[in-house]
Each structure stands twice: as C-alpha cells, then as structure tokens.
Amino acid sequence: MENILDLWNKALQKIETKLSKPSFETWMKSTKAHSLQGDTLTITAPNEFARDWLESRYLHLIADTIYELTGEELSIKFIIPQNQDEVEAMPKSPIKKMSKEDPVDIPQNMLNPKYTFDTFVIGSGNRFAHAASLAVAEAPAKAYNPLFIYGGVGLGKTHLMHAIGHYVIDHNPSAKVVYLSSEKFTNEFINSIRDNKAVDFRNRYRNVDVLLIDDIQFLAGKEQTQEEFFHTFNTLHEESKQIVISSDRPPKEIPTLEDRLRSRFEWGLITDITPPDLETRIAILRKKAKAEGLDIPNEVMLYIANQIDSNIRELEGALIRVVAYSSLINKDINADLAAEALKDIIPSSKPRVITIKDIQRIVGQQFNIRLEDFKAKKRTKSVAYPRQIAMYLSREMTDSSLPKIGEEFGGRDHTTVIHAHEKISKLMVEDEQLQQHVKEIKEQLK
C-alpha cells in the first residue's frame, strides 16, 4: 500500500467532492493520517467535539473512500493527538430523514439569502458556535436539541440560524423550516387569541421540522407567551424536531424566565459567540468587499478593523460608508479618506490622560496662583484653598496614588491629601460656587 500520508491526501480530495464546502472545511480539512496498523487506519481529529462528529457521521464515507482507492476494507479509528484519547469508531444506525408529509411553502423573505455557511467568516470567537450549527444542520434533532446560541448584538447569531435553515432546505427541499423572532411569536400568539385562531397558530409552529427562534430573551415577563412556547417546545422535542434558539445572554441570566423553560433550554448545547479578534475582523471586511465587488486597500481594512472591534454590523457598515464617501467626493480610497469618512462614528483619538500638573495649571488659572505655590509651604487661604481643590481633583481624575499626589504638592503626607479630599467633598455639598468652580475646571481638563 502507498505511503499513508499520500493515501490520506488522495482520500481527502475524493471526500471533498462528496461533501458541501462548509462540511468539508469544518470536519475533514483539519484531520490527519496518524497510523496504519494491520487493517486499522487511525485518523487524528483536532478535538473531542470533532472526533465524536466524525465517528457518528463520516465513518462509512471514509471507509468507502479508502476502499475505492486501495481495494481494501479497513477499520477506521479516531484519536485526539493532544492526549491520545482513542475512541474506536462504531457503525451508527442510519439517521432518520425528516418527515416529508404535508409540505409547507416557506415564505421567500423568511431566510436571508446572504446568510449561509459559505458567507460566514469563522474566527476564534465563533468557531465552536459555527461547528455546532453545522452539526445541527447536517443532522436535525440528532446532534444537539435544542441548540442555544448567545452573544452580543451583531456578532452572527442570526446569520448562523439562517445558515442552518438554508442548509436543511438545500438538502431536503420538502423540509418545513420556520424562522421568526420571539417578538413575532408573541404578536402572532396575541392575535390568535384575539381572533379565536389559537388552533391555527399551534398547528403552524408545532408541525415543523426545524424551528429557529431569534432573541428569545424578549419572552421574559410574558407569562402566557412563555406558557405557549413551553408546549410548542415540548411537542417539537418529543417528535424529534430540531429547535434552535438565540439570545443576548445565557438562559440562566434571562430575567423572569420560567424555570421549566430555562431547564429545557439547557437540555441540548449552549454555545456563545464573542467579539471577533483583529484577524477575523479583517477577514470579515475582505469577504464583504469581495461580495460587493469592491477593491479596498489593505491599509484601509486594517484601519477600520482597528477602530471597530465589537460589532460585525458596524464593521461592515463602516466599510460601506467609506466606499460611499469616496464616491461622493470622487477621491481614491485610502486610510486618510477612511478616517475622514468615519470621523463622526469613530473618536479622532483616545481620551487624553489627565496629569496632576494639568490640574495644577488649570486650578492656578482659575484662582490666579502660580504653579510653584502648590508646592510651597504657604498656608494662607488664598493658596491653601486652591491647593486643596487641586488635591481633590488629582484624587478624582487621575490614577495617581496618595503618596504620589502628596509628592507633587511639595512632598506633603498622604494624610494631607485625604484631608483635602474629604474637606472639598463636604464643602461642595453646601457651596454652589465651589461646585461651579470644580465643574468648570473639569470641563477645561477634558
């Protein structure tokens, strides 16, 4: 038999033609041939999650592909190289296909055609959520049910939910897939009660193969809607139908959510999405530019990625804003133009660090005393009072320690600084003129 590495590379090339691009890149691309002993081929998987999925879904595909290449029937074993946690791959029973009875037409605008696995940019903050979503899409109700995805606004939760819906329909056109927000679920439920159409409402959402419900946190506090969703959840789960839920927080942190619903959300897999790192943000911008047919210099994408670090929607929106601005003023896109285009949504610079000397300078101007007076031993009220105000502000507006503040005021003891802070704090409660002085000084410092 040929070299094991060459054999596995050929096998991967064949397998790639038999799988969708997202499936191949998520599950197969990171595998490696480990060893061939007797009639057992050992393959490494990057982690336990991938290993379990490979053995449950791709065992026969791999074995058949190896047979096509070699004419030999080999047993397949998967291991995790980090800890050599070997698991003998066992044949699994065929996965039952979803019901094709009573097909329901899915509204064309229900799933965004741009939100697919192919257009999703994978990074460290969403890799697990992406893999779990793909697993659910490939085997609805067999992998994780429910799948609960949570994370901040604009990080890709809705994208993954739509991608699951597209994948299921692409591979089973008669599948009944419904996507909606919890707000829409609530409104339709209320309308069904008002119009005496509760039965129709229940039939619509309890006779689907995949239910994708977004922003479940909005059910908090809505007791009747929670009751209805509880029974909808139970019906679908008992009939082995897939449920995918998204939220801006994990189930345990959703206020006024009934315990019985919370516990059901925790039956399956809970995965989060975190803000993308710099490399992922740049990759997102590149993919967006390519999709829109835009030629954007690398320096511009790096600039935008450095300025917007938490929200993918804002990131993509910033790119479009730069392109639009370039078109309006008829100038080439570069980093300077990007900075000009985004000046209203990106601070021109980080807030400046306020120093004790800055405070002394502004207080001195307000009370007409010299900088050296702050360090002098003078105890006249005309000097001591502004000095105490400056000490108060140094404590409030800088990160300097008490000894450091005392040092900047002529080597005074830290207890003097504490006394000054307490005195000015008390005086400000009673003295409106002092309040105004301090307010003006703070404004000038900022």
Curated annotation (Swiss-Prot):
Positions of region (Domain III, AAA+ region): 110-326
UniProt-annotated binding residues for ATP: 154, 156-158
GO cellular component terms, semicolon-separated: cytoplasm; plasma membrane
Keyword Nucleotide-binding: yes
CDD domains noted in UniProt: AAA, Bac_DnaA_C
Ranges for region Domain II: 72-109
Start and end residues of each stretch annotated as Domain IV, binds dsDNA: 327-446
Keywords, in A-Z order: ATP-binding, Cytoplasm, DNA replication, DNA-binding, Lipid-binding, Nucleotide-binding
Lineage top rank: taxon: Bacteria
GO molecular function annotation: ATP binding; ATP hydrolysis activity; DNA replication origin binding; lipid binding
Cell compartments where the protein resides: Cytoplasm
Annotated InterPro entries: AAA+_ATPase, Chromosome_initiator_DnaA, Chromosome_initiator_DnaA-like, Chromosome_initiator_DnaA_CS, DnaA_C, DnaA_dom, DnaA_N_dom, DnaA_N_sf
Major localization class: cytoplasm
GO biological process: DNA replication initiation; regulation of DNA replication
Stretches the record annotates as Domain I, interacts with DnaA modulators: 1-72
Entry keyword Kinase: no
UniProt free text on domains: Domain I is involved in oligomerization and binding regulators, domain II is flexibile and of varying length in different bacteria, domain III forms the AAA+ region, while domain IV binds dsDNA.
PANTHER family on file: CHROMOSOMAL REPLICATION INITIATOR PROTEIN DNAA
Subunit structure: Oligomerizes as a right-handed, spiral filament on DNA at oriC.
Family as reported in the entry's similarity comment: Belongs to the DnaA family.
Function comment: Plays an essential role in the initiation and regulation of chromosomal replication. ATP-DnaA binds to the origin of replication (oriC) to initiate formation of the DNA replication initiation complex once per cell cycle. Binds the DnaA box (a 9 base pair repeat at the origin) and separates the double-stranded (ds)DNA. Forms a right-handed helical filament on oriC DNA; dsDNA binds to the exterior of the filament while single-stranded (ss)DNA is stabiized in the filament's interior.
Name of the protein in question: Chromosomal replication initiator protein DnaA
